Amino acid sequence: MKQKSIEMLVQGASSLGITLEMFHVEHFQKFYSLLLEWNQKMNLTAITEEEEVVIKHFLDSLSVIKSGKIKGGEKVIDIGTGAGFPGIPLKIVFPEIGLTLLEASKKKVNFLNFLSQVLLFEGIEVIHGRAEELGKVERFREKFDIATARAVAPLNILLEYAVPFVRVGGHFIAMKGRDIEEVYQCKNALEELKCEIEDVIEVRLPFSDILHHLIVVKKVDVLPSKYPRREKAIRTKPL
């Protein structure tokens, strides 16, 4: 990475309340290098220009810190992580979190496993599978302090994918864009899935005019066993 990109990463992280040391920067540099290398073999990301990756992938991922829920030591699952966003940047900054990356694409899982080995991560597990299936598995169901998702699906659909993994009292952090009208259209999903919206946090990404929101959802009771439903039901008959 060029010096300008490194400075943007460090300054941008600082504006989010994060101090990056040199070893953090080195990890991000390795991440970027491997992202470009593997992206030539598979579709990991359409964003490859250095400064864009810093802003739209690295700093966007780190913006989850603004939720105030990740302080280190939490069990975190990143659902539909893709190329590792936001999970890997969070793990770089908070190596003590226990991180599970859930991804349905086997090729992306292979990339994430290789990346984790290169970065010498401990306390990380990469799972090849689908959220609506693993959310019913005892080893994963209601076992995490925090679930994250950067997917583009509507919030009421994301809730059914994510909430089954979250323990009672834990949180789901949905990374959404500028428009958050859907927050006011998911009352039924919140009631059915035994959760409530605790906070909506506006985040303006450093060095850009991009406005995002973090939707912080708290799990308040044990989830009924019928959830999550099968994918077709989730998609065609959303709560």
UniProtKB/Swiss-Prot annotation:
| Record flagged with keyword Nuclease | no
Q: Which UniProt keywords apply?
A: Cytoplasm, Methyltransferase, rRNA processing, S-adenosyl-L-methionine, Transferase
Q: Which CDD domains match?
A: AdoMet_MTases
- EC number assigned by the record: 2.1.1.-
Amino acids binding S-adenosyl-L-methionine: G80, F85, E103, A104, S105, A131, E132, R150
Q: What class of enzyme is it?
A: transferase
Classify the source by domain of life.
Bacteria
State its location(s): Cytoplasm
Keyword Transmembrane belongs to the record: no
Record function comment: Specifically methylates the N7 position of a guanine in 16S rRNA.
What protein is this chain from? Ribosomal RNA small subunit methyltransferase G
Q: What is the source species? A: Caldanaerobacter subterraneus subsp. tengcongensis (strain DSM 15242 / JCM 11007 / NBRC 100824 / MB4)
